[in-house]
């Protein structure tokens, strides 16, 4: 039996995957059940639910402990643990002080590399850090990071080749330097 229960339809979904929930929530029967539920509440009660949900999103989440039916504990059921399902995304088992309040913590291998360690750890502490092949990057930049452009608009290294004027003394149009040579010949 699936772990996702739809209060509006009074059914357990077969799978707990987001795609199954999305398909269920966009289904004709579910939409009809939602419409019927809120129309049976009356305008004032439905508007109070909408306002409460809007307030929760504006304040960054939170948990209303009121027993409100769909979205909360079903009427007549026993309440679950505080903040069950409403506390936001689950945090990974590792945590550190380098992550900001809205940033996920860094994995231990990344912390080891940032602290200058070689990334080797004791058995059972997780996979070794990824190693990147290739030539060393100037300015001690980490692999995969682009270097900032210089004043002339190019990154470090030699300047790109400049277009040479044709032997007849005429200069090539400026776009030919970026154009395929065959295409440039066709254009004349």
Swiss-Prot record:
The keyword RNA-binding applies. It holds the Pfam family zf-U1. It is found in: Nucleus. SUPFAM superfamilies: beta-beta-alpha zinc fingers. Gene3D superfamilies: Classic Zinc Finger. SMART domains: ZnF_U1 (SM00451). GO terms for biological process: mRNA 5'-splice site recognition; spliceosomal snRNP assembly. One of its GO terms (cellular component) is commitment complex. A zinc finger (Matrin-type) spans 4-36. U1 snRNP is composed of the 7 core Sm proteins B/B', D1, D2, D3, E, F and G that assemble in a heptameric protein ring on the Sm site of the small nuclear RNA to form the core snRNP, and at least 3 U1 snRNP-specific proteins U1-70K, U1-A and U1-C. U1-C interacts with U1 snRNA and the 5' splice-site region of the pre-mRNA. HAMAP family: U1_C. Belongs to the U1 small nuclear ribonucleoprotein C family. This is U1 small nuclear ribonucleoprotein C-2. The lineage of its organism: Eukaryota, Fungi, Dikarya, Basidiomycota, Pucciniomycotina.
